[in-house]
Regions:
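Nucleotide-activated sugar donor-binding and catalytic core shared by glycosyltransferases
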Residues: 1-251, 257-391
Length: 391
């Protein structure tokens, strides 16, 4: 039996790793499945663990007020050292591009434990965009023994870098997670009704959309956008809400003060508006429910670039670069950066032009078929694995 440890610490990681935990747990004779969380995003992480019913075996609980990247890296490195010495896993799986992933991979390397990198090979080729994520994933990629690339383009990036790890093209586990949650919401009316109540308590009455009203769903929290870029983004959102008084704009605000402060600078202390709703951060379940109800998604998130197209939603990305160019090529995503006029113009086009909207919403999602977790488990079990191909 192989002892496999999955390490993650943020909400996006948890969304993409919890389905993999559940898949490993289906094979108790082949794998002992161990879960270690770092708590890099404490409250938001715990919410996802509850949704997927995943109970960690180890919890580093590193979250502290005012911590920076130095603190996170040091705490994860030393915390994982002690966990690895006690647990002695045969392989450690980390995800993507977080500081948790890189520090955990480095800690495993120091003890010569093989590392599997889930969502390997994403690149912008600019180490400061996104920062620090681009360098994080490059470092993790150098350490990994197994590279689980979500797409053929990710595989190509790894091959060009001459990555020493064995590469498997699996699709992205976020599509597995999305399928699980959407199926739950479609088959369990009580659960769907519960999301309506949760959203209402968070500050938005989703029944406002029952008459065909359009919804622009917004998320924004990336470090590289803080400062003038974020002010420009928020100003564009304000101007759009005034230009389209019959369209609802909903922004679940990240807990980070660097996000909340510029919002108040632009909108004032009182955020109450007739068609703009600043609400508290949402758990994954209600966020997927709201995303499914949306017309357009405006975001600087990485994962949402993969998830929203799976629901047929056009995505405008408030970043200058993306490590997910497959979506640009397929037409499901457009880059708008932090440029005020470009954001306003692109959102306006999707709200006003039915042909442009249909072109984006009907484009093929290139990120997966819901079988990524199965491919990863079979790969680590030494079985033949079919290669994910973009249709």
């Amino acid at each position: 039996m192989k002892k496999v440890m999955l390490v993650f610490g943020t909400r996006p990681e948890a969304i993409k790793m919890c389905p993999l935990v559940k898949e490993f747990q289906k094979h108790p004779t082949e794998f002992e499945t161990i879960v270690c969380v770092t708590g890099q995003h404490r409250e938001m992480l715990d919410q996802v663990l509850t949704i997927f019913d995943v109970k960690p075996d180890y919890d580093l609980n590193i979250m502290k007020q005012g911590q920076d990247l130095y603190d996170v890296t040091a705490r994860v490195l030393t915390g994982m050292r002690d966990v690895f010495k006690e647990c002695k896993p045969d392989v450690v799986l980390v995800h993507g591009d977080t500081t948790t992933s890189t520090a955990a991979a480095l800690a495993a390397f120091y003890q010569q434990i093989p590392v599997g990198h889930v969502e390997a090979g994403l690149r912008t080729h600019n180490i400061y965009s996104p920062w620090p994520e681009e360098m994080n994933r490059q470092i993790t990629g150098r350490i990994a023994t197994y590279d689980f690339a979500p797409t053929p383009l990710s595989e190509k990036n790894l091959q060009e870098e001459k990555a020493h790890g064995q590469i498997f093209v699996t699709g992205n586990t976020v599509i597995d997670a999305l399928h699980m949650v959407v199926d739950k919401l479609k088959t369990d009316k009580a659960l769907a009704d519960e999301q309506i109540n949760v959203l209402k308590n968070a500050g938005y009455d989703v029944t406002r959309l029952d008459g065909g009203k359009k919804l622009v769903l917004i998320t924004g929290h990336r470090r590289e956008n803080f400062g003038d870029g974020f002010i420009s983004m928020v100003t564009a959102m304000k101007d759009l809400s005034e230009k389209y008084p019959d369209v609802d704009f909903v922004y679940p605000m990240h807990l980070n003060p660097n996000v909340r402060k510029p919002i108040h600078e632009v909108f004032g202390e009182d955020l109450t508006r007739p068609n703009f709703f600043f609400i508290e951060p949402l758990q994954y379940l209600e966020f997927v429910y709201l995303m499914e109800k949306s017309t357009v998604v405006l975001t600087d998130s990485g994962g949402i670039q993969e998830e929203a197209p799976g629901l047929g939603k056009p995505v405008l990305v408030m970043r200058d670069t993306t490590e997910r160019p497959e979506a640009l090529k397929s037409g499901t995503v457009h880059l708008v950066g932090t440029n005020h006029d470009l954001i306003v113009n692109e959102v306006s086009t999707l709200l006003d032009d039915a042909v442009a909207y249909e072109k984006m919403s009907k484009a093929v999602n290139p990120y997966g078929d819901g079988k990524a977790c199965s491919r990863i488990v079979r790969a680590l079990n030494g079985e033949a694995v079919d290669r994910y191909e973009v249709k």
